[in-house]
């Protein structure tokens, strides 16, 4: 109760200074229901917030650490490509779990409030099917809530932009691709909102990444949109428990069981989408 009183007080102070962004810590995803209303856009970051790989080696942190390791022997571009290929291979193999068991109830509540809801995936567009498959296994369907815009390309791949740099919305999930292309979330939101005739009056963003929430808050301040960043502490604590020594063992065991043909097929898959 005290936590919610603090959140209400923070929001009141925020209303008094409409250009300021608020970031609050939450332990339960149901907290969004306290503030969401019609014309609110509620965003849920998927990777390492909504769902987690059961093995640490499948986390985003492993991808970043693996890239650093590979940079000692490969060029920066080669290291990024190889690390992502290896991480993608793992993402098809590991099991996943839902961080918030009551997320379905939260989505139902947001639907009743007529709030816009958007899942945010940091994966590139050629992993759309894999991401949707993972969410379906938990009966998580973002299309059960009102959509702020239709599915489709936000930035279509052209001769000047690769498939990895493209952004798209599928099943009410925005695929940003930052795990592959480094696209910042504030830039992605700018592209999203530029194509919307009726922008949201407020954005609520649920994530475990405090820095990402701060950058989105700065963008919303410039765009004159109320912003409430919700730092989801159960997911944040899990990210912080990442153990590179443990993942090194997991990666070693996985690599022993994967053939060259497996990674060659993945590489062919990526190139065919490019």
Swiss-Prot record:
GO CC annotation, single: cell outer membrane
Coiled-coil intervals: none
InterPro entries attached to this UniProt entry: DUF2608
Cell wall biogenesis/degradation listed as a keyword: no
Main subcellular localisation: membrane
Pfam families, alphabetized: DUF2608 (PF11019)
Keywords: Cell outer membrane, Membrane, Signal
Subcellular location: Cell outer membrane
Signal peptide interval: 1-21
Topological category with respect to the lipid bilayer: Peripheral membrane protein
Protein name in UniProt: Putative outer membrane protein CPn_1073/CP_0776/CPj1073/CpB1118
The species this protein was found in: Chlamydia pneumoniae (Chlamydophila pneumoniae)
């Amino acid at each position: 109760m005290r936590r919610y009183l603090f959140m209400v007080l923070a929001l009141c102070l925020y209303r008094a200074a409409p250009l300021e962004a608020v970031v609050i810590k939450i332990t339960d995803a149901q907290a969004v229901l306290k503030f969401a209303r019609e014309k609110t856009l509620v965003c849920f970051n998927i990777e390492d917030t909504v769902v987690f790989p059961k093995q640490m080696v499948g986390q985003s942190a492993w991808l970043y650490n693996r890239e650093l390791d590979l940079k000692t022997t490969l060029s920066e571009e080669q290291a990024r490509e190889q690390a992502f290929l290896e991480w993608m291979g793992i993402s098809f193999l590991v099991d996943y779990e839902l961080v918030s068991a009551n997320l379905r109830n939260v989505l139902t509540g947001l639907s009743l409030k007529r709030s816009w809801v958007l899942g945010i995936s940091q994966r590139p567009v050629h992993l759309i099917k894999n991401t949707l498959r993972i969410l379906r296994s938990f009966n998580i369907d973002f299309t059960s809530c009102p959509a702020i815009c239709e599915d489709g390309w936000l930035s279509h791949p052209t001769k000047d932009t690769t498939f990895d740099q493209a952004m798209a919305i599928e099943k009410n999930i925005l695929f940003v691709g930052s795990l592959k292309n480094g696209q910042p979330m504030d830039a992605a939101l700018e592209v999203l909102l530029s194509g919307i005739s009726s922008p949201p009056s407020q954005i609520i963003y649920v994530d475990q990444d405090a820095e990402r929430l701060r950058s989105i808050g700065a963008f919303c301040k410039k765009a004159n949109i109320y912003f409430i960043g919700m730092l989801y502490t159960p997911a944040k604590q899990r990210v912080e428990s990442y153990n590179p020594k443990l993942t090194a063992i997991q990666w070693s065991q996985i690599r022993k069981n994967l053939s060259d043909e497996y990674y060659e097929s993945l590489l062919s898959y990526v190139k065919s989408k490019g």
